[in-house]
């Protein structure tokens, strides 16, 4: 089983600040996906196949990486971006998820 470790576990960013969330895999993976979850809702697909934005995701989000190291970046934090973000990969026959990164607004 491939283990995904996200960093940081919790972070706070000011509006307009650049934010980067990283996901490290215990073995090389071909594709990494990202989900956004807001309080009381199910996780939504956010970025798929490393860098492709899901429908409706703002262009300030981007994804990158290869091998065992991947990241999600927000170029300029907005209030609506406060959420929990999860990385996820599939390695037959298992889906595995990272533990999540809680992104809050710094006030």
Swiss-Prot record:
Q: Which domain of life is it from?
A: Eukaryota
Instruction: Tell me the organism.
Output: Mus musculus
Question: Would you name any one GO CC term?
Answer: immunoglobulin complex
Other information: This chain was isolated from a myeloma protein that bind galactan.
Give the residue ranges for region: Complementarity-determining-2.
49-55
* Region of interest (Framework-3), ranges: 56-87
Renumbered residue ranges of the record's region Framework-2: 34-48
The segment annotated Complementarity-determining-3 runs over: 88-96
Does Transcription show up as a keyword for this record? no
Return the annotated region ranges for Complementarity-determining-1. 24-33
Specify where the region named Framework-4 lies, as residue ranges: 97-106
Q: Under what name is this protein listed?
A: Ig kappa chain V-VI region XRPC 44
- GO BP annotations listed: adaptive immune response; immune response
């Amino acid at each position: 089983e491939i283990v995904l470790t996200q960093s940081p576990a919790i972070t706070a960013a000011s509006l307009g600040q650049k934010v980067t969330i990283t996901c490290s895999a215990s073995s090389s993976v071909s594709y990494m996906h990202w989900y956004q979850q807001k309080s009381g809702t199910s996780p939504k697909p956010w970025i798929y196949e490393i860098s492709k934005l899901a429908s409706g995701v703002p262009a300030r989000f981007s994804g990158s990486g290869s091998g065992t190291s991947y990241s999600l970046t927000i170029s300029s934090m907005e209030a609506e971006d406060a959420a929990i973000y999860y990385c996820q990969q599939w390695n037959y026959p298992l889906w595995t998820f990272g533990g999540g990164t809680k992104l809050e607004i710094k006030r």
